[in-house]
Regions:
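N-terminal cap/lid segment of alpha/beta-hydrolase-fold proteins
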Residues: 13-39
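Short beta-strand element of the alpha/beta-hydrolase
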Residues: 43-51
Length: 181
């Protein structure tokens, strides 16, 4: 299904009128920490899914969405910030883009969706993310039927194997971008 909320058509509200709730939820035995932004009249709900970097919850993006009547859960990636677990880094050659890691991160996103669903069962729920989330979000959406839509920014257009080959090829080559752009 397709769901679109034109932000310019919504009545933006001040951040002061948005309720926030710190949450922790479990995924595969690990406790993940985040915050839910709850506008007065939410039209939809989203979970923000991380890219590959070691980044905590995305507060500014969550605030922007919530000011436009979207309920948002943003959480610290596993092993980052207040979340437990082990972070698998984006360095070349790590298991960051392995099938096991991407499925694990998809389970984390799915657990976040289940947490939002408990907050408000009547809203359409989606996932929004950047970069590596372009692999994670479709996996989660395929396995969790509560997910009704996906928004992907700067998402990968190649397989993880092709991405890994590219990383190995360009790693340490300071002249790569000068010669190939």
């Amino acid at each position: 299904s397709f769901f679109l909320i034109p932000i310019n058509q919504l009545n933006a509200q001040s951040l002061d009128s948005i309720k926030t709730e710190n949450v922790t939820f479990k995924s595969e035995g690990v406790s993940l920490a985040g915050i839910i932004y709850i506008p007065k009249k939410p039209q939809a709900a989203v979970v923000i899914v991380h890219g590959s970097d070691q980044v905590p919850r995305m507060i500014k993006f969550a605030e922007l969405l919530s000011k436009n009547n979207i309920l948002v859960l943003t959480y610290d990636k596993r092993g980052v910030g207040e979340s437990d677990g082990v972070y698998a880094g984006p360095e070349v050659g790590t298991n960051n883009i392995s099938r096991d890691n991407l499925n694990l991160l998809a389970k984390d996103a799915s657990a976040a969706v289940n947490t939002i669903h408990k907050e408000n069962k009547n809203l359409p729920i989606g996932l929004v993310g950047f970069s590596q989330a372009g692999w994670i979000i479709p996996i989660a959406a395929n396995k969790n039927k509560l997910i009704e839509f996906m928004v992907l920014f700067s998402a990968p257009t190649v397989t993880t194997l092709e991405q890994l080959r590219f990383q190995f090829y360009t790693d340490g080559r300071t002249d790569f971008w000068e010669n190939h752009t």
